[in-house]
UniProtKB/Swiss-Prot annotation:
Disruption phenotype: Significantly impairs the rate of cell growth and, when combined with a previously characterized dynein inhibition, results in dramatic defects in mitotic spindle assembly. Residues 562-1712 form a coiled coil. This is Kinesin-related protein 4. The lineage of its organism: Eukaryota, Amoebozoa, Evosea, Eumycetozoa, Dictyostelia. It holds the Pfam family Kinesin. Residues 469-480, 488-532 have a biased composition (Acidic residues). ATP binds at residues 101-108. GO terms for molecular function: ATP binding; kinetochore binding; microtubule binding; microtubule motor activity. InterPro entries: Kinesin-like_fam, Kinesin_motor_CS, Kinesin_motor_dom, Kinesin_motor_dom_sf, P-loop_NTPase. Residues 22-343 form the Kinesin motor domain.
Amino acid sequence: MDNNNNNNNNNNDKNDKNELNKIKVAIRVRPLNSRELGIDQKIPWSISKDTISLSQNPNINFTYDYVFGIDSNTIDVYNAIAKSIVNSSLNGINGTIFAYGQTSSGKTFSMRGTESIPGIIKLSIKDIFKSIEDSILEKDYLLKVSYLEIYNEEIKDLLNPTISNKKKLKIHEDIYKGVVVANLKEEIVISPDQIFALMNFGEERRHIGSTMMNDSSSRSHTIFRMQIQSTCKQNGTIQMSTLTLVDLAGSERVSSTGAEGVRLKEGTHINKSLMTLSKVISKLSEEKTQQHVPYRDSKLTRILQPSLGGNSKTAILCTITPATTHQEESISTLQFAKRAKRVKTNYKINQVADANTMLKKYESEILELQNQLVKSEEINSLLRNTISTQEISSNNFKLGMKRFNDAIIGGSLINENKKKKKRRNTLDPSYLLKDKIIKKKIRKSENQKIKKIKNSENNISSSSSNSSGEEDDDDKDDENNYSINQDDKDDSNYEDDDDEDEDDDEESDTDNEDDEDNDEDNDDDDDDDDEFKDNLNLIEPLDDETIKKIKDLDDSLGISGQVKVKREDLDLIYEELEENKKLIEEYESTLELLNNQLDEKEIEHKELLIIIDQWEQECTNRENQNQELLEIDQQSKQSIQQLNDKLLETKQQSKQSIDQLNLQLIDIESESSKNKKSFENVLGVFEKSYRLAERLEDKYFTKEIESKKQIETLANSYLQLETTYQQQLNINQQSQQKIQSLNNDIEQFKLVWVPLKDQVNGYFQENQMFKQYIIELEEKYNTLIDLQKEVEQNYLTNTLEQQRNDQYQIEINQLTTEYNNQIQQLESTNQKLQTQLYNLLANATQSTQTLEQQLQTSKQEIDTLTNEIEQLKNQYDIIRVDNDNLSKESLELKQILLSKTQQLEEQLSLAQQQKGNIEIIQQLESIIVDNQQSIDQLKIEFDQSQQDNQSIKQSYNQLESTLTLAQSENQRLLTENKQFITSLNEIKSLFNSIQQQKETIQLEFNQRLQSWSLDSEKYKEIISTLEQSNQKSIESYESKSLEFQEKENQFDSLLTNYNQLFSKYNDLATSNESNRLEFDQFKKDSNQSIQSLESLERSLKSENDNLLQQSNLLKSQLESIEKQKQDQLIPIQLELESKKCELSKLSSQFSEQTKQVTQLLISVDQYKISTNKLESQISDRNEEINNLKLKAIEINALKEENISLKDQLTKLKKAPKSQTDREKDMIKKELEKLREKFNAIDAKLKQAIQDKQTIQSEKQSLEREIKDLKRSHTSTETELDKLKKTHLAADVKSKDFIALNKSVEILTKSQEQLKSTIIELESDLSKKNIELEKKQEELVTLNQDKLEKEKKTNQLESDHSSATIKLENYENQITQLTSEIIDLKSKFQEFKSESESNIKQQEINLKESNDLNQQLTNDKFELTKQLSDLKVEFDKSKQLWSTRSSESNDTIKELQESIISKDKERQLTSEQLVKLTDQINLKTWEYNDLNSQCQQLTKTLQNVKSSNEQQEQSIVSLESQTSAKIKSLELEISQIQENHRLEVLELNRCKNQLSEKQTLMEQDNIQLNERIIQLLHQKTKHENEILSMESNIIDLENQTKELKSKIETAQQDFEIEKNYHTGLNETNTTTIKTMNEELTRSNQTIQQLLFKISKLEQTSLQTQQQQELQQATISAQQQKQQQLADDQEKQQLYQKIKLIEKELESTKQKNLYITEQFTLKESEYLDTITDYVCKEKEFEKSKASLKTSATKIQALNDIIKKLQEEKPQQQPVVKVSSSQVVNQNGQPIKSILKKPKLVIIPREQLQQPPQFKELTLSTLNSNDSNCEPESVSASSTLTSLQSISKYIGKRSEQTTLEHDLTSSTLNLPLQQQNKKVRLVITKNNKTSTDNLTTTSTSLKSKSSSNGENKENQNNNIIIKNN
């Protein structure tokens, strides 16, 4: 069973870990203080469930696991956060709870609490012991407790403060325990009272101070840690866990707290540690792998390392003050909590399978203890050996001294000037060798054992040594060095001196740090040293000759007794000298050691000074380099500015040149009709200017490239400087490490101060003892006064007094001698102590002076020293005051004693006179002796105290001198700091200048952007005007072209068949060329469209990729959600299974309880039956009572009869005896009968009383049953209420609750029915009781009348009264119960109303969810609609495109393949769109799947609810279930609620995400639609442009190529500019980043320096420099805020710049496109102008020729007429072949018309009709008849005449001309045939005329057909002259 339980617990813990692996975060808002209520009365925070937000700005929302308002209790907080952690800590899971917040926000209140309101710590301890009591049978527990505080970054043990005072506690790492504080006291704990006592003990020693914010603010972080070790009794498995409860000190502002001095120092340390904590949590919340987390920056984070993101289940309680004044601090705490909420932990069960590990641990501890014992034994043996060696050496020395004495007694004299041999020769060297060998062996054994111990420790904790701190490594290095030095020293030769051996011994002693050696080294004075040296100079070894002489003298002279005595004295003196000499040698050795150490430290100091100088030089070099870099940056910026200025100048020049060119173009357009050469010159100028612009741009780009190279070189140099800077930082770190090692040395020197402090404390204790002695003396003085009073009564004799006085004087003299001896001894000891102190102080002062000169970082220690000195000052002042008081008191005592001694002498003189009372005198004498002894002791002690005071004064003077030195050093450091501050200010000024430069650059950039935008607007305006002008010209051109076309058709009709054929041929050639050019143009356009489509495809692909990524993200999120839900469903399923088991149990219990209910119903029925029986019994009893009444009447009658009989008896007495006897017999018989009747009546009465008692007992039983029923009813009601609460929380649907309500109503109805029946029964009972009472009263009245003397009646009355009292009590109880039932009903109704409101809210939520689903479906439907619309639009565009393509296919059949390819490409795009739609459909399917999953979840919830319904049905019968099970069910249901709430939140989040993604999809679709529309517009534009540009392609190929090349160069230039700008932006961003990093570093350095300055200035300039520091911190914060604002502005500007760049790119593309079109149109326009000019000239020539021809024709007609008149008989002319039509220049018209030309006539010229001036024909030569006639085309003349007649408007003249012409041709004479015209004569006249007409008509028809073909070929009318 236990294994199963453990497995279940493990599974539950795993599930909890999967669900709750994040840190639990709760917020608690405390109520307002009295101080805060006076300032502001409104609370700006609004709290709703798990969120907290600002009421003014609701956008600032924060959601957490729990949020507790002002009215919250600590018990609720504990149950929400801490209880689960405490319970899991008992199962082997580590747990931590800590409170975080501002000062005076209620952290200690919530953690510690008070006596009335316990905090989290007390509640957790109580729960731990409760759970231990519950599980004692299963497990054994071992609890250990430790309590520490972190005060000013120093760890202090609150349970053992002496250790923390003696030495610093260090942090280590252990494999099993983790991060551990070494030498921390751990108390084994049995009860909670013991823990509370330890906590109180620690709280008394905790640092607590008062500030402006809080009267008792905690000035340190406290960590209460409990180690819980539990072992299972069956398996033996061990579970280890630690529960850490942390009370953090609050973050504080100096301005709000008003901290000064020590408080400011404490506040800075607190803020520093909290900053590191926030850094750690921010790093952990980022969820990045392989990142550095700064745990080691603070001791708090180092200790709490496993709790923060490690093997621990943690919870954070963030407390907030609701006042408006602390709004910023509260927001910062909330942000901290938000970051902490994202931190994940990896806690696990710390379980050990076997007890082997513990055994190993204990074995290792035993080994350590054994090793320590071995060490102690070896040390003892060493001491013994040293003692033995000292004894041997002393014996040898005694022998030498004896010899020396013999020599002195012999009378020999010692020559001091002689050379003396060394003392070593006189001694026996074997002893020294033995000593050396023994010492070496002992040292070797010690070293070997130490190494073994270290190896064993390393084996035990192999991993802990690797992960231990830097301090441990330093200690190990020191130990290794020590052992190496010892080995090196031990390996020295035997021939070394004794002094060196002694040095080695003393070095080992000093390394072991024994205090006894320090005491022994400093025992004697300097004067004694000089005397001993003189004696030693005397006591040196003698020569052999002198010794022989001394022996001879001894032999010759005799040794007298006096010499023996002197020798003994000399022996004693020599022994003392030996001891003194040893002490001197040891002292000298210690001095040498100290000197060596001082030399080493001086060397180290020099090295450090050299390093510091190097560092300072490097810093100066770095500063110089930085300045050089800044100068280079400035130069580069200036060069960039110059380049930009040049760019601007070039751009302005180019703009000016372009403007000038535009003006010139306008002028040229106006003057184009006049001068063509000027136009060509302008083109040349334009090309030259363009070439100049290109050259300037090339120069600019070369300069730009050079500047880029310069910038790259500067960047490389900057990187090199950064590397050098990092190297120097590493060097600085190494120097800091060395400084830390020196600090450790200082700490070791500080240990020297500890015995001094102990001595001072001893002196203080001795002073206290003196005070006690004085008090005792005062008491004794009072006794003396009493004795003196007795002495006044008794007069003593003078003789005895004199004798006593003599004895007293003798004793006083003895005491004075003893006193003087003791004083001398004390003075000697005092002098020794003073010398020791002086030496120690001198050494300490030397060491501190050297170290203080070495280190600048020893400021804190100087401060601590100053504090200690201040304490010593205070102590000294106290001691001085005490000593002054003592001196005064002693003087007063002396005076009193003198006065009293005088009085005693007077009294003794009187006593001598009287001579009596000897015994009294003896007693007085003894008292006086005692008093004198006490006085002597007091004098001795007083002298000692004076001596101690003198020594303390000396030490105080020395300390004052050290203080002065420290203050001078502080002043020096202050000056250095001021210099540093000035340098910082200079850096700040430089930084400000850099920022100003940045701002100027940004302004320039903005100005450039504005200028670019203005230029773009100007270009747009120009383009719009040009487009308008082009449109107008095109419209006019179209109108005039129509007119011109008509004229052209008329002109073409006059041309001959030859010209027609030639024109056809030319038309075919031109059509081929135009088709080719159109094909090329179409290719280009198609390529452009393909490129645009490819770009579209790319964009669509990118969008598709984004959509795919989003879909993948959605899928991953959905999968994660599904996994989470599955993970959550697993515990729910397990819980369901457990609940099924419980339901089975509950069903069994339900069945049992149904049985109980049935039994109760049966009992109720029985009760009813019993009541009926009782009613029947009561009726029977009433009948019996009536019978009894009748019997009572009979009894009265009998009494009356008795009375009558008595009367008769009296009468009969008077009668004779016989009669009396008879009568007596008769009376006896009657009396017996009466007695029998009376007995029967008594029996009946007894039965009635018994029946009454039985009725009362039955009544009581019924009352009990009723009470039980009521209790069960109340219990069922309470259980039902609880079950309703639990099920209402679990239920969601209203139907379930309605069913519950119905069941509850049924129960309530049944209960009400039961109540009504009970009330009815009670009313019946009360009625019957009343009737019984009445009847009983009647009985009582009867019995009182009849049987007053009988006791039974009294008992009945008393019973009846008690019964009535009980009934009354019962009635009162019933009334109370009814009132309680009414209250319960009211509560039940309230609960009903609340439940109904909850149901309504749930229904509203369901409706909202349904609405959301509907909205989602509507959005889907809308999306599908939009997609369908897009498809329709796409199809329409397809159709349009197909129609246009079909129209183009009619004219250009050769381009069908390309169009088909385009159609294929469009199909591909459509397929892509279809794919997109498919993807959208897939996403909709995925969304549907999500909905289906949600529905499945709802189904599962419904199933759960159905199971809950079953539970409800089962719970209706759970009336007698225990409260513990109900509590467990409540907890489980609350967990389900939390899970459900989390699921709902997740679903809402998913919905929100889906809605956001849908909105994004909609936006994307809108963008796609816009893009499609744009593409359609572009297509239409392209089509129009294609149709408009087909005719103008031939002459524009070269120009387009040139323009393309120019455009490509311009694009390249633009890309280069863009890259340059991007490079500039990147450089700017990099520089900004670097500057920000430098700013942060400088801020950090500034903070550190300000912190150091604040520490240094505490002693001298507290107030002024604190204000400066405050201002500096405020300015730093403002700078930080400004930096943040600047960064935000930079980001915004960067985004704006990006947008502007995009817009510029788009505008540039548009401009390029417009310029291309403009150039094309311009070239076309110029070509049309040139053609038009040529045409005009030709027309003028043709007009002149026509005039001449007209004159000639008239002449011909006249000639013809003449010829007809002269020779009418000649035959008519059939055919007239006309000669060639010639211009004025003699050029034939045929040759002119062969050349096809494109003529584009502007509107202004087309508005006026063409003016025909002359029309010339060649004259007819009629000289020779034999010459060949010139061929003249009649059709040309006809067409020309027809055209003229059309323009003139005289159609009638045409017929006449034709008729005249025909007639003239027919009537030509035969004589003129051979001259100018060749006449072809035919027989019939009609045929000739017909042929002429047919030819003319055919010409006309052909010309018209040609014109139609031309119109079909080109929409733009082009005139072709053949």
